Regions:
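Electrostatic, structured charged patches in enzyme active sites and in nucleic-acid/phosphate-binding
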Residues: 1-145
Length: 145
């Protein structure tokens, strides 16, 4: 079906960039099957009382927005106007929870080989700015029991 569509309209049917498929269900929207499976695993751990305060898609500010002042020349006077020079940079963690009083931040990746340069920088900034080390989850077979 996709090949026929592509030939009829002379376009390429796009696949997900890293081969993941979004999951939408009663629990919410997840970027991959791995992320949804990890959510089920962690929510069971929370019900058993092993972890607490499980949260999804938590945003951490890494670099605040940068503002500057530009002088506007009006007919009667000059006026300084605040303008945005650079947008803020933030990291959105897949999962954040607490175990034994320690905050744990996790990010699900399909493979340890599909880690982008942006993620590497944001992971280092998380450690530097918030003193939190991001744990990479790549395969269900390596999850702790």
């Amino acid at each position: 079906m996709q090949e026929v569509f592509g030939r009829l309209f002379q376009c390429k049917v796009m696949r997900p960039k890293y081969g993941n498929h979004k999951i939408k269900n009663a629990y919410g929207t997840y970027d991959s099957q791995l992320e949804f499976a990890r959510f089920l695993f962690l929510s069971n751990r929370e019900k058993e009382g092993e972890i607490t305060n499980l949260r999804r898609q938590v945003e951490y500010l890494l670099i605040p927005a940068q503002y500057g002042t530009e002088i506007k020349h009006l007919k009667t006077k000059d006026k300084g106007v605040r303008m945005l020079l650079e947008r803020s940079c933030s990291y959105i963690a897949d999962f954040v929870y607490e175990r034994n009083g320690e905050t744990i931040v996790e990010d699900c990746k399909g493979s340890k080989y599909i880690i982008t340069a942006d993620f590497k920088i944001k992971k280092k900034l998380m450690l530097w700015v918030h003193q939190i080390q991001v744990k990479i989850i790549s395969s269900p077979t390596f999850w702790e029991k």
